[in-house]
Amino acid sequence: MFTYITSLPSPEWEKSFPRTISILGSTGSIGTNALDVIKSHKELFHIVALGGGKNVQLLAKQAIQWKPDYLAVQDETSKEALIPLLPINYKPSIFVGQQGYVKLASLPEVTTVLSAQVGAAGLHGTVAAAKNGKVICLANKETLVLAGKLIKNLCLQSGAVILPVDSEHNAIFQALYTRNPKTVQNIILTASGGPFRNKKYEFLKNVTPEQAINHPNWKMGTKISVDSATMINKGLEIIEAHYLYGLPSEQIKIVVHPQSYVHSLVEFTDHSLMAHLGTADMRMPIAHCLAWPNYLNVGVEPFVLSKIGTLTFEEPDLDSFPCINLARDALVAGTSAQIILNAANEVAVDAFLKKQIGFMDIPILISKALEADSTPEPTTLESIEALDQQTRHTISQWIEVH
C-alpha cells in the first residue's frame, strides 16, 4: 500500500516565507535552475549557503550575487582558488569537503536544503539534513538508492520532510499526496527513451559520449544524460519510488513517452489514470518543492494542449536497455545490491565519458558487480560508504584490464 516516506510540513508552512535556503550543488544543472527560480521570487527566499564543488569560477559569481554567509567547496585547492575571486569586503565562512556540505545542511538558521549534488557525493549532506529536521528538496536520487532505509528512519526521528525534485517523482507526489493510500494500484514513471530510443545492440555498441549526452528533450548534466541514454536513470527512479512511496517493484511501472509532456501517472484501483503534464523544464518541479504547497510562475511558456500534437507511449526495450531490469533485481536483492548498482554505474559512466570503455560495457560491468555481491546488508552510514568505496575500487580495477 502507498505510504509516503515522511510526514509533510505543518499547515503553517504554506505561509512561512521568506524560506531560508542551503543549496548543495549550486553550480550544477539543478542548482543553477534553482537560483533562476529564486531570482524570479526574491521576496520568498533567502539564500544562506551555497556549495559548489570544484567549479569555483561559477561559485564565486553566485556568491557575489547572493552574498550567502556560508560557502562549501570540494577541497583545499578549490578554497584557495575561490578566496581571491571574492570581494575584499565579503567574508563568508568557507567549508571544505564532505564535512563542509554536512555543515551547510545542518545550519540552524536554514529551514530548507536543496540536495542537488550528483551521485553518491550527495549522501552525507542529505543524511545531515535528515538528522537535523530540515525540509529536504531532494534532487539526488542516488541518496535513496544508497540509503533509503536509513534516510527514512532519520526523517521519522527528526521530523525532516522530503519533497521530490525529480520531474517524474514530483509529478507522482502531486498526484498522490492528498489521496487515500488504499486507492493506489500502480505508479507509472515515464521515460523519454533518451537519444537512442529504438536503437539496437549493433548501433549501441559504437555510440560515443558526444552522442550519449545529446538528450532530445531535457537539458541536464553529463552524468545524468548518460544515465538517460542507458535508461538506468529509470532503474534508479524505480528504487527511489520504492522508498518514497512504499510500493514494491511490481507496482512501479515504466512507459516510454518520447515527447516528455506527461511526466508520470498514477493508476488507481478502478483502473483510472491521473497524469501530470507540462513543459520539460526543471524549474517547475524545483519551484514546486521550494515553495510547496504553493505554485510559482517561473517564466515557463503556457502548456497549450491544442499545440502539442500527438502523445505516444510504448513499452521499453529491455533487451537493448538491460539496466532497467538490473535495477529491479537490485531492489529485490536489498540494500547492498543497490549500493553496488549505483557505485558500478558511476564508475562505468565516468570511464565511458573518458572513452575507456564502450557504451554497452556499462550494463556489463554493473551486472558483473551484482553477480559478485556477497555482502551483508549495511545498516550504518559508515558501512554503506565502505561498500560504495569497495565497489568503486573493484570496478576501476576491472576497467584497467579491460
Curated annotation (Swiss-Prot):
<feature type="binding site">
    <location>
        <position position="192"/>
    </location>
    <ligand>
        <name>1-deoxy-D-xylulose 5-phosphate</name>
    </ligand>
</feature>
<feature type="binding site">
    <location>
        <position position="29"/>
    </location>
    <ligand>
        <name>NADPH</name>
    </ligand>
</feature>
<dbReference type="GO" id="GO:0070402">
    <property type="term" value="F:NADPH binding"/>
</dbReference>
<feature type="binding site">
    <location>
        <position position="30"/>
    </location>
    <ligand>
        <name>NADPH</name>
    </ligand>
</feature>
<dbReference type="InterPro" id="IPR036291">
    <property type="entry name" value="NAD(P)-bd_dom_sf"/>
</dbReference>
<feature type="binding site">
    <location>
        <position position="233"/>
    </location>
    <ligand>
        <name>1-deoxy-D-xylulose 5-phosphate</name>
    </ligand>
</feature>
<feature type="binding site">
    <location>
        <position position="237"/>
    </location>
    <ligand>
        <name>1-deoxy-D-xylulose 5-phosphate</name>
    </ligand>
</feature>
<feature type="binding site">
    <location>
        <position position="140"/>
    </location>
    <ligand>
        <name>NADPH</name>
    </ligand>
</feature>
<keyword id="KW-0479">Metal-binding</keyword>
<dbReference type="GO" id="GO:0030145">
    <property type="term" value="F:manganese ion binding"/>
</dbReference>
<feature type="binding site">
    <location>
        <position position="215"/>
    </location>
    <ligand>
        <name>1-deoxy-D-xylulose 5-phosphate</name>
    </ligand>
</feature>
<feature type="binding site">
    <location>
        <position position="234"/>
    </location>
    <ligand>
        <name>1-deoxy-D-xylulose 5-phosphate</name>
    </ligand>
</feature>
<dbReference type="InterPro" id="IPR013644">
    <property type="entry name" value="DXP_reductoisomerase_C"/>
</dbReference>
<feature type="binding site">
    <location>
        <position position="28"/>
    </location>
    <ligand>
        <name>NADPH</name>
    </ligand>
</feature>
<feature type="binding site">
    <location>
        <position position="237"/>
    </location>
    <ligand>
        <name>Mn(2+)</name>
    </ligand>
</feature>
<dbReference type="InterPro" id="IPR036169">
    <property type="entry name" value="DXPR_C_sf"/>
</dbReference>
<dbReference type="InterPro" id="IPR026877">
    <property type="entry name" value="DXPR_C"/>
</dbReference>
<feature type="binding site">
    <location>
        <position position="167"/>
    </location>
    <ligand>
        <name>1-deoxy-D-xylulose 5-phosphate</name>
    </ligand>
</feature>
<keyword id="KW-0560">Oxidoreductase</keyword>
<dbReference type="InterPro" id="IPR013512">
    <property type="entry name" value="DXP_reductoisomerase_N"/>
</dbReference>
<feature type="binding site">
    <location>
        <position position="168"/>
    </location>
    <ligand>
        <name>Mn(2+)</name>
    </ligand>
</feature>
<keyword id="KW-0414">Isoprene biosynthesis</keyword>
<feature type="binding site">
    <location>
        <position position="53"/>
    </location>
    <ligand>
        <name>NADPH</name>
    </ligand>
</feature>
<feature type="binding site">
    <location>
        <position position="228"/>
    </location>
    <ligand>
        <name>1-deoxy-D-xylulose 5-phosphate</name>
    </ligand>
</feature>
<feature type="binding site">
    <location>
        <position position="142"/>
    </location>
    <ligand>
        <name>NADPH</name>
    </ligand>
</feature>
<feature type="binding site">
    <location>
        <position position="168"/>
    </location>
    <ligand>
        <name>1-deoxy-D-xylulose 5-phosphate</name>
    </ligand>
</feature>
<dbReference type="Pfam" id="PF08436">
    <property type="entry name" value="DXP_redisom_C"/>
</dbReference>
<feature type="binding site">
    <location>
        <position position="54"/>
    </location>
    <ligand>
        <name>NADPH</name>
    </ligand>
</feature>
<protein>
    <recommendedName>
        <fullName>1-deoxy-D-xylulose 5-phosphate reductoisomerase</fullName>
        <ecNumber>1.1.1.267</ecNumber>
    </recommendedName>
</protein>
<dbReference type="Pfam" id="PF13288">
    <property type="entry name" value="DXPR_C"/>
</dbReference>
<comment type="similarity">
    <text>Belongs to the DXR family.</text>
</comment>
<keyword id="KW-0464">Manganese</keyword>
<comment type="function">
    <text>Catalyzes the NADPH-dependent rearrangement and reduction of 1-deoxy-D-xylulose-5-phosphate (DXP) to 2-C-methyl-D-erythritol 4-phosphate (MEP).</text>
</comment>
<dbReference type="GO" id="GO:0051484">
    <property type="term" value="P:isopentenyl diphosphate biosynthetic process, methylerythritol 4-phosphate pathway involved in terpenoid biosynthetic process"/>
</dbReference>
<feature type="binding site">
    <location>
        <position position="166"/>
    </location>
    <ligand>
        <name>Mn(2+)</name>
    </ligand>
</feature>
<keyword id="KW-0521">NADP</keyword>
<dbReference type="GO" id="GO:0030604">
    <property type="term" value="F:1-deoxy-D-xylulose-5-phosphate reductoisomerase activity"/>
</dbReference>
<comment type="pathway">
    <text>Isoprenoid biosynthesis; isopentenyl diphosphate biosynthesis via DXP pathway; isopentenyl diphosphate from 1-deoxy-D-xylulose 5-phosphate: step 1/6.</text>
</comment>
<feature type="binding site">
    <location>
        <position position="27"/>
    </location>
    <ligand>
        <name>NADPH</name>
    </ligand>
</feature>
<feature type="binding site">
    <location>
        <position position="55"/>
    </location>
    <ligand>
        <name>NADPH</name>
    </ligand>
</feature>
<dbReference type="Pfam" id="PF02670">
    <property type="entry name" value="DXP_reductoisom"/>
</dbReference>
<feature type="binding site">
    <location>
        <position position="141"/>
    </location>
    <ligand>
        <name>1-deoxy-D-xylulose 5-phosphate</name>
    </ligand>
</feature>
